[in-house]
Amino acid sequence: MIEEMRKLLATLDDGEISPSAYDTAWVARIPSQSNATCPEFPETLEWIAHNQLPDGSWGDRNHFQIYDRVLSTVSCLVALKTWNLGHDNINKGERFLKQNIYKLTKDKGDLLCGFELIFMTMLEEAKQKGLDIPIDIPALKILQGYRQKKLQKIPLEMVHSIPTTILYSLEGLQDHINWEKILQFIGTDGSFLSSPSATACVYMHTKDPRCLEYLKGVVKKVKNSVPCQYAIDLFERLWIVDTLERLGIDRYFQPEIKNILDYVYKYWSDKKGIGWGRESYLKDIDDTSMGFRLLRLHGYKVTPDVFLNFMSSEDKFFCFPGESYHGASDIFNLYRASQVAFANDNILTKAKNYAHKYLSQLDKAYLDKWSAKKNFFQEVEFELSNQWNSCLPRAYSKSYIHNYGPNDIWIAKTIYRLPFVNNELFINLAKEDFNACQSIHQSEIQTLLRWWAALKFGDLPFFGDKVVTAHFSIASCMFEPEFSELRLFYTKYALLSSTLDDLADYYGSPAQTRCILEAIRSWDPSLVSHLSEEVQICFSGLYRTINEMVKSASKVQTGSSINIREHMQEQLAKLISAQLVDAEWMERKHIPSFETYLSNATVSVGMQDLLLSSIFFCGESISKHLMQEIKNSRCLQLTCLIARLCNDIGTYQFEREKGEVASSITCYMRENRGITESQAIEHLQGIIDESWKELTEEFLTPSQIPRSIKRLMFETARIFQFIYPKKDNFKDPSKAMASLIQNVLYKPAE
């Protein structure tokens, strides 16, 4: 299956797209250069004759969309009548229209692009050719009204002076176009906005050879027919990469994805963005948003200022420059792009606010302008409820596997399909991969539960069963099979760190913490033998587990000059030293300065020691130089800061009831007299938000620190953002959290 997909990705060209009967019929009407009584493209007429559907219509065989069927059918009938061919086809088509044209109703949001312009013109041509089509029906009068309103809004001077989306529907404005002037907007490929029908119409009025060469090329490539748009090479490539990533199977195709993004970047403009094809001179916010997000995620240099091209002075956004409308899917992709913001990316903040407000007000019955996806509204709901920096990747993939439609259709002048974006191959691999990884994760949980029982941690009165929750957190982020040892180590270490923290909370005193610190520095369990049974159980488990981890790490770090046992001891000692400071503050009821608190608390939160010990299992060789780079990295500092502040906000009420007085909230309130608790939390949330922007930039910008290690730090920050939204979901999982764990770790993808 993977090899089959690689072969598919290796064949990407100008875009694989389903044929359009409507556009093919326009091309079929073109007279031959050598004999005007014959068609230039007789093969397209054969295609029309052989692709009429059983009910007499033309259009998508597997999806009945009334506007698509009626428009395509009228277009095909006009083409056949032009050459006085296919009388049986014409009779069947006329019968279909008589039975179905009345189904056209008032626009419910499902009109095709430019339908109100092109359909009424098409009907007039059908009437002139003597086709028997009913035209005196209420729906057509309504459509005629739509057409008149649209024409009143279109300044014809602008149509002839700057490129607009009207070029895509020129065949609907034939009586209003100056054909000589309009030729200034012909694309370098000879098309008008990549539309075969619009280009065919222009050719029949101008006989411009560039148009004909474009159409010849499309008919040849698509085999006797044409699609509604061509080429769509950038659009197809971007949506393929996005689909692979959302389904969680992109790791199998990294070389192919790099080739795709290199191709896209070649046509990227920081000033204008991109359109659906490399020849598209009219850029759009949909392709630009997708391109920006994917290119930034993969380390390419792109500027968010590109979105100025799609923003009004009132901070509103639109799909095409100089126009005033947009659909939901394009703003949805703008919203997704806005979440990969770096520091000072102010326009992305504006984009996020605008998109979030618009998407939050969508009705479930909304019909998108550009696509008819299986579960589009559910996709929007999920994204709004799960921001990128707090959504665990495997939870995201499980959701998208459910929402993905292998048979989804897309909307332009007609409906169309993208078989390289929506297909059974992608979804089948995604399900197979998800379930295979899930099976490995379940096996790891059993290993961890046996380890847990052997250490007798379950006997501790203060420590609940956190094994599954702890494992779920890392397994939902670093989920690949090759990170199995990392997940086991990370989970064990996280549980040990949490045990030490709980031990300090329930039984700790500065004196006891000093004993534990000395035992860690000496690596001697006998130094805690005089302490309580709970302390001895904890230290014994810590001692045995760290020794096992050192052995495992030494096996995978054979060339490292680092003394791994001493390194892990050092990290543990730093953690306990920081917890000792916490204990002393608590004993004295001392509230330090905000800066002093954070200096210690970003260590006592336990992420620095966890990460600096876990990195041995990231598949990279860790030298002393690299270790020092990681220790000093802004990436590590920001991860610890986010973890601490998220933890403080989530556990504040519980810790206060327990008697703890020093937290980032209380320290900030003490320094800023008169502010409320909620104001302090709002300030801390602001720090978290800005830290995320900086961390995102650190993570996505190439550096000496390997990507897998930066990813582990980034995912750890993401875990804390997820675990501690407003409460402690680690010690006391909510029902939603428990349900998510069940869904990701135990329910297979079906």
UniProtKB/Swiss-Prot annotation:
Residues the entry annotates as binding Mg(2+) 3: 647, 651, 655
InterPro entries: Isoprenoid_synthase_dom_sf, Terpene_cyclase-like_1_C, Terpene_cyclase_plant_C1, Terpene_synth_N, Terpene_synth_N_sf, Terpene_synthase-like, Terpene_synthase_metal-bd, Terpenoid_cyclase/PrenylTrfase
UniProt pathway: Secondary metabolite biosynthesis; terpenoid biosynthesis
SUPFAM superfamilies listed in its UniProt record: Terpenoid cyclases/Protein prenyltransferases, Terpenoid synthases
GO BP term, pick one: diterpenoid biosynthetic process
A molecular function (GO) term: terpene synthase activity
Motif placement: DXDD motif: 284-287
Catalytic activity from the UniProt record: geranylgeranyl diphosphate + H2O = (13E)-labda-7,13-dien-15-ol + diphosphate
EC number: 3.1.7.10
Membrane-spanning segments: none
Cofactor: Mg(2+)
Note on how the cofactor is bound: Binds 3 Mg(2+) ions per subunit.
Sites where the protein binds Mg(2+) 2: 501, 505
Pfam families xrefs: Terpene_synth (PF01397), Terpene_synth_C (PF03936)
Residues binding Mg(2+) 1, per UniProt: 501, 505
Family that this chain belongs to: Belongs to the terpene synthase family.
Further remark: Selaginella moellendorffii contains two distinct types of functional terpene synthases (TPS) genes, the typical seed plants TPS genes (SmTPSs) and a microbial type TPS genes (SmMTPSLs).
Protein name: (13E)-labda-7,13-dien-15-ol synthase
Organism classification: Eukaryota, Viridiplantae, Streptophyta, Embryophyta, Tracheophyta
